[in-house]
Design a protein with these regions (language model features):
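Glycine-rich phosphate-binding loop of ATP-dependent small-molecule kinases
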Residues: 1-193
Length: 193
């Protein structure tokens, strides 16, 4: 699937572990996995590390984790101040508005699973030798903060879903349903441009 004309297309996926962010065939796309910022990235504005990975015209980039970590992980773990993360909502909206204004197609997904399904998937990972590498103590620690993350997620969706860059909620307790819904949204959005 290629964007119409020479537009840039970016898809941003954010969600709880293990909501289903990894099941993606990257052929034909630039996939940008996002981990914790390194020393060089920490010395710059938090959006810089994303800006440098934006796709060139006519290409598609998929960000697996995004700058929205600023208002979730960084907020809850104390990696930034309250002023930093509250200001970030407007900074992220302005960033996305600028991208859309330059002709980019922006598609944002919140990949959602409920708490019971997360436990099922965590337990399956823990009990399956070939998948044990996917589960860490940090995953369990973050699960203990479910309610705090729920507040942060709701704030993120409330303050950053805009007419030019709306969030699409993907219910992913059923992985096949989630994949079909995601593909339909991507197709419909690109075809509408």
């Amino acid at each position: 699937m290629q964007p119409a004309k020479a537009e840039t297309s970016s898809e941003w996926r954010q969600g709880r572990d293990p909501a289903g962010l990894k099941a993606l065939d990257p052929r034909g796309y630039e996939v940008v996995p996002v981990a914790a910022p390194n020393k060089d990235e920490l010395a710059r504005h938090f959006l810089w590390r994303f800006w440098k990975n934006l796709p060139k015209d006519g290409h598609i980039a998929i960000f697996d984790r995004t700058w929205y970590g600023r208002v979730m992980v960084e907020r809850l773990e104390g990696f930034c101040t309250r002023d930093d993360w509250t200001r970030a909502y407007n900074e992220m909206n302005a960033f996305e508005d600028e991208l859309v204004g330059c002709g980019a197609i922006v598609i944002k997904f919140w990949i959602h699973i409920d708490k019971d399904e997360q436990l099922v998937r965590f337990t399956a990972r823990q009990n399956t030798p070939s998948k044990q590498w996917k589960i860490t103590d940090e995953d369990w620690r973050n699960r203990d903060k479910w309610d705090q993350y729920e507040i942060a997620v709701n704030d993120m969706l409330k303050y950053t879903s805009t007419p030019f860059s709306p969030w699409h909620i993907i219910e992913s307790n059923d992985k096949k349903y989630a994949r079909v819904k995601t593909i339909r949204i991507i197709n419909d959005t690109i075809m509408d441009e």
